[in-house]
C-alpha cells in the first residue's frame, strides 16, 4: 500500500524532511531503534507471538508540522513469533482530531535474549522490554515523536461480547483532567460513580451512565465503542474478560483502563493493621504542563482508619520533596461505598495532596490526587516481601517526564555483587531540536531501606533516583534531579 495514504505517515515524511537540518546540526545524536546490550535471559523472537494491545501517551510534531503537541495512541498488532507484525488498529489522537491510518499495516520486530527489542511499522520505531511473554514496556524512539506506554497480550476468546460486571477504572486527559470510579456493565449499559478532577478545580463525585451502550467488540481486534452521558465517547479495546483499555474517539487526549472489581465488600479493615501499601502516580500541573509531577511512597495502615507510618518522595514543577516521613494521617473506606475511599497523609517537613481511591481488589486500588494545582493519578498496592535487604533479580522498567526536554526510557536493570547493571533505550525530545534516540549500557549502586525505599545512582544517567518496592524487584520510581518517574517489574524466568 501507499504509506502516504495515512495522515500520520504524511507527518512522518514531512517531519523527516524538516528534521534533516537538525540531524546535521546535532552531532552524535544517536539512531532510532538502537539496540541494548543484552543482560542475559531466555527470551527469543518467539516470545512475542499472538495479538497485543499498546496504550501510550507522548509528544510529537503535529500533522501540519507547525508545533509539537501531546498525543494519545492505542495500537493493536499481531506478532507471528518470527519477526513479522500485522497492525490492525492504530488510533492516534492529537490537536482535537482522531487520526486512523489505512489498515492493516505490516512491520517487523526483534527480541533479544534479555527481553529488550524493537518494533517498526508505518514509519515509527519503538523500543520495548518484555516483562514476560504477555506484557512489555514500550517507548517511541523517533525524531518526530517520543512516547511511553505498556503492551499486553489480548485474549481473543473474549471478543464475543461487551465486558460485563463490576469494574474500576482510571483515565487521564493530558493537561486537562483525571478520573477514577466504579461502574457496573450490564448488557453493555454502564452505570456507576466517578470522581472527576479538572485542572484548577477540586474533584467532584458524580454519577456516570452510558448514553450509548458498549457495542460488541470487533471479532478480529477486540475494539468496540461507547458514549457516556457527559458527552464523552470512547473506543475500547478488550484485553480479556476482566480488563479493557479505552481512549477518546472524539479528539480529546483522554486514555484509560478498567479492571474487574473483585474481593468486596470493602471496609476500613480491608487496609489491615500493619499492612503497608506502595503507590506511584504522575500527572500534569497548571504551572509547568505535561508530566510535571511524579510521586511515589509507602504508607502503613492500622485497619481502623489511621495511617501509622511511611515515607514519600515527589517532584513537582522541578521542586524536590525527598524522603519525607509519614508522621500520621487518616483514611476512609466505608462498608457501603463500593470500594471508594480517601487517604490523607501527614508528612514531616512537607505536604502532599489527599488521595481519592477505588479498590480494584483487596490489595490494589486506582486513585487520583485531589488538588487544584495538578491532574495526577496512579495506583497503590499491598507491599509484600518486607523487610527488604537487597535487589535480587532482573527487572524491566519504563520512565517518562521532563527536565530540559521530554524524556522516555525503557530497559532493564540486573543486580550484581557490587550494585547493578543498567541498560536503557531512551528518547530525549526537544520541541525545537526534535528527538534524540539513544541506547546506554552502564552500571550503578544503591542503598536499600527495610521499608522498600531504595536510593539509586545510575552512572552517567542520574545520581538521584528513588525506588519504592511493592514486591521484590517491582515497584515505582522517582528521579529527583528532574520531573521524571516510572515503574519497574521483575522479569519472568525464561
Language model features by range: what are they?
Residues 2-17:
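Bacterial N-terminal signal peptides that target proteins for export
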Residues 24-28:
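C-terminal motif of bacterial Sec signal peptides marking the signal peptidase cleavage site
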Residues 29-494:
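Mature soluble binding/inhibitory domains
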